[in-house]
Regions:
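Short loop/turn segments immediately following beta-strands, especially the blade-tip
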Residues: 106-117, 157, 194-200, 236
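Short, small-residue-biased leader/transition segments that mark boundaries at the very start
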Residues: 1-2
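Loop/turn-rich, solvent-exposed surfaces of beta-rich toroidal or solenoidal domains
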Residues: 96-97, 126-197
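Beta-strand initiation motifs
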Residues: 9-13, 63-68, 113-122, 159-163, ...
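Extracytoplasmic beta-rich repeat domains
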Residues: 15-45, 51, 69-84, 90-103, ...
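Blade-level signature of beta-propeller repeat domains, shared across WD40, Kelch, NHL, RCC1
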Residues: 87-88, 190-191, 197, 211-236
């Protein structure tokens, strides 16, 4: 279910049941999504983009009317949809191929249209290791992300082509952050990797903070505020 509440009174403005049919074959845990919706303006109209395990939907945030849907994915997902230059990007829920390998698709879609846009509005999709945890970032037309196989990747936002990939030492579940002209990544083993955006992989700095990081950090002026499994830390 999706619903809108009045922020001053807490009263429900509208409620909308999400589609049930695409989720019927899935396990109970597989039907779940932990995704923060995205609101974007498309040709003068606001759309609320909400991707789930098996379907991505767009709604009118004023009324709750479903504008379009796009089917794809098979299990739970977490990453938030994101946008650049009028294109919506999101991870599907993870799937399993005939060989038993987990994977997800990174989707790029045209958010214009109405109804079922599965066959018409996909600009590109890129298969990779399970990609449903962290939300990628876009900088100067390039997408930066890390998959569940520890592959840090740079991808062209317009084509989906891989620009470079580098195998890292551990998993990255916190979302990367663009700050001070660089991109910061935080791993589950406490690695902090700072890279320079661009078509070549260039590490500016890296260090370890001893404790795992799962939550996306906040940046305050010249400091990083982050939560590990044991501490709330401020790093200058």
């Amino acid at each position: 279910m999706l619903f809108r509440s009045d922020k001053k009174t807490g009263k429900t403005v509208w409620k909308k049941d999400r589609p049930e049919k695409p989720y019927q074959p899935l396990t109970v845990i597989g039907r779940k999504a932990y995704v923060t919706p995205l609101i974007m303006n498309v040709k003068g109209r606001d759309l609320l983009i909400s991707n789930g395990a098996a379907v991505c939907n767009a709604y009118d945030p004023e009324t709750g009317e479903e504008i379009w849907s796009l089917t794809g994915g098979a299990e739970s997902t977490i990453a938030m949809p994101f946008t650049e230059k009028g294109i919506v990007y999101y991870y599907t829920g993870f799937m399993v191929d005939p060989a038993g390998t987990d994977y997800s698709d990174l989707m790029a879609i045209n958010p214009e249209g109405k109804g079922d846009i599965t066959a018409t509005n996909v600009l590109w999709k890129k298969r990779s290791g399970r990609l449903q945890l962290l939300t990628p970032v876009i900088k100067d037309g390039l997408i930066y992300t890390v998959d569940s196989n520890n592959n840090m990747m740079c991808i062209e936002a317009t084509t989906g082509k891989e620009v470079w990939t580098t195998r890292m030492r551990s998993n990255f579940n916190a979302s990367p952050v663009v700050a001070a002209g660089n991109i910061y990544f935080f791993s589950v083993r406490g690695d902090v990797v700072v890279i320079k955006p661009g078509r070549e992989m260039q590490i500016v700095n890296q260090f370890q903070i001893q404790n795992p990081v799962w939550a996306t950090p906040a940046f305050l002026r010249n400091s990083i505020i982050l939560r590990t499994d044991r501490y709330l830390c401020k790093i200058n």
